[in-house]
Amino acid sequence: VPTTGKIFFEGKDVNEIGLEAHRRNNVAFIFQNYNLIDYMTPAENVMLTSKKPPIPELIKVGLTEEEAKRNVLKLSGGQQQRVAIARALASEAPVVLADEPTGNLDEDTAKEITVLLKDSAHVLGKCVVVVTHSTEIAKQADVVFRLTHGQLLTLEEAEKARQVESVE
């Protein structure tokens, strides 16, 4: 494991621009525990990361316009997860890091969110990294990294990734 060196993103040394600035400008997160601003509405949470109108972004992930205007604490866990997903996908960041993004969603909604994540990569050109234990989600990946106890076990390209039996 490297302990020294430099990290470059789009040709720029991340340390020179600052880690905080790099994260703010280049990386959007979908946290497993949502990390929403709890005194705001879903629409206000999305507006934190995007100049796009928030309601259409929230509708894309399955919320109604009425739900988009409620306080986030009045939403179910699955609805809060959708807000976190909308917030990340609406951002201008070229990288999306998603920790179990479909963990609290029903099967149909999880499939819809997976399509949105894939479209973000294939249509919008974002780098989408998903951490998951779901075999079904892993099968949708272009590349699968299998980790065990923090160590890289295997790296599988698109076709082999679709044949994944189980994810540990």
Describe the function of each predicted region.
Residues 92:
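Conserved catalytic motifs of ABC-family nucleotide-binding domains
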Residues 85:
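Hydrophobic anchor residue at the start of the ABC signature
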